[in-house]
Amino acid sequence: MSYEINRRLVAKRSPLETSAEVDSVTSGIIRGAFETICFETAIHLGRAASSAIINQSNERNGSIIDAHGRLAGISVGVPQLLFISPLAIRWGLEYYEEDDWGPGDVFLGNDPDHGGGHLPDYTVYAPCFDSAGKLVAIQALQAHQGDTGGKDPGGFSVDSLDIFHEGLPIPRLKLVHRGKRRGDVLDLLIRNNRLPSFTGDIAAMIGAAEHGANLLAELVERWDSDTVRAAMNFNIVETERRFRNEIEKWPDGCYEADVWIDHDTVGNEDVQVHVACTVAGDQLTVDMTGSDDRAELVNVWNTFSNSRGYAMAQLVSMVDPTIVKNEGLFNAVEMVIPEGTIVQPPPNKPAALGAFHPACEIGEAICIALSQIVPERSSPQVYKLGMPNAVIGFDDAGEMWMDQGVDVRASDASATEGVDGWGSMCSGLGNLILAQAEDAESRFPVINMSREMTCDSGGPGRWRGQPGTLNVKKVLEPTIAVAWMVSMKHPLRGLCGGEDASAYSNHFEVGTPNEYKIENSVRADLPAGAVCAYQYGGGAGFGSPFLRDPAAVREDVLDEYVSVEAARERYGVVLTGSAEECDIEVDVAATEQLRERLMAERG
C-alpha cells in the first residue's frame, strides 16, 4: 500500500465509448431514472436492515458508478458518503478480470487505504451488463455498520494506533458469484462482527444492490446501452460546465482559512486544518497544504476519499443547488490533498474518528475561506461533536447491543445570510434521521430523560445560530460508554462578523459523588442507573449581532432562545417588561444608544 494507490484511484477517467448521441431531454430522463433507482435501493436497504443506525437513522445511501468508475448518479442521502463511493469501486474495477466480474455478482469494500471511508462505512456494489456482456454501470450502496471486529466493541476506539485495532479492512471481496451467495465469505464477515443484527444488515445491503442492478438492467434494455452510456457522458460534461460557470462569477484570488480541532484522543492540542481556495477564471483549486502532519497524533487521521468527499459536500452547498451531482463536480475542481498529513495519512492509520474530525474541519475551512466572496451561500455543512456517546452492552445470552447515540438534537446549524440557523442539524447531513427516544428505549436498556434546547447557546449574529440542546440519558444496566470531546476550545466559527457557536460539554455519572466531565476521550464502565448529560453546541452566527432586528431579538427572548441579559450584552438590545409575564418590549431609544456605544467599544 502506498500513496500511489490514491494517485491512481483519483486520476481523471475518460468518457465511456459509445456511438450514440443524446440531447438534454433524453439525458435528463435517464438521469431522473438513475436518481429514482438510487432512492429506491436506499429505501429497500433501510426497510430490510436490522440495525437502528440504518433502518431508523437512515445512515445509508445509493449511488450509480459508470463502467470507468465515474460517479454517474445519486439520490438523497448523506452527501459525504455519496461522494466517497466511487474510489472503493475503482479499486475493485482494477481487478475486473482477475475477480471474474459478471452478471449477478456483488462485491464489498471498506478499506480506508483502498478508496474507502472509515471501516464502519461498507460499500456494497453490483455490476450491470448489457446484452453483449459489456459492463455499463454499477449499483452501489453505502451504510454504517455498528461493529467492525476491532479490539473495542462498536468500531470506535479512542486509543487505536493502527487500522487493525479498529477492525477488519476489506479492499475488495466478492460476496455473490453469478447470483449465488458465497457462504464461506459471509460466514467470515459475520464471525468478525459482534452485533447479531449485522447478519440482517449485510443481507439487506446485498439484496438492495441486486435490486438496483436489476433496475439498471431494465433501464438499459429499454433505452439500449449505447444511449445510457451517452447520457452518462452528457450529464457529467453538463455538470462540469455549470459548475465552472458558477466559479467564473467569483472574483479571482486566493482565499485561505485555518480551523483547529481542540485535541486528538490522547491530548495533543490544536490540530490544524488549512485550506487555500484559489479562483482563476472558471478553475477552482482547493489546496489543503499546511494541514497538520505531526506523527504523534492519534485518531485524527482522515482518509483520502473522506477528505475529497467532505470538501465536495461543502462546495456543492455554495453553488447553484440545481447543478446535478456527479463526476463533473470533481472534474471541475483541482484538489491538493498533501500526503503524510491528517487529510491524507500514511497507510494503516486508524480512520474511524478521523471521519468526524478533521473531516468536518475541511468543510468548515472551505466555508470560511469562500465566505469572503460568496457570503450569501456560506454556511458550514458540518457537525462539531467529537463523537456521540456510544453506549454498549451485552444481554444475558452474551449478544452485543449498541446505542449509537445518534439521538434527536439541535446542534451545529449555523446561520447564513438572511436566515437564522434552522431545525435540528445542518442540511448537509442530508436524509440522516436522528433517533427518536421511544425507538431507542424500545431496543436498548436506556431512558432519555430530557432533550431540550439551551438558552444562549446559538451564536449571536445579524442572523443567529440554532441553539444547541442538552440531552440527558440514563443507562439501566451496566454498560460501556465511549466518548471523545472536541469543540470546547474551538467551536463553530461565526461568519462575516457573526459570533462563534457555544462550546460542547459532556458529563458522566451526573448527580453522584462520582460525577466527572469528559475533558478529552474516555472508555468508561458505567454502573446501572448512571446518567450522562451531553450539552451540544449550537450553530454560529452570521453578520454583526448589533445589526439584528431588535424585534427578532425580542421574539428570541420570548422563545427562550436568548436571555434578557444576552439580548443586552451580546445584541445591544434593551428590553423592558418581564419574560415571565410575556410583556417584553424593545426600548428603541435605549437600544440605539447602547448599540452605538458597544460598536465603538468593540470596533
Regions found by a protein language model. Give the residues of each.
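Glycine/proline-enriched, intrinsically flexible loops and inter-domain linkers
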Residues: S2-P103, L108-S131, L135-T285, T289-G603
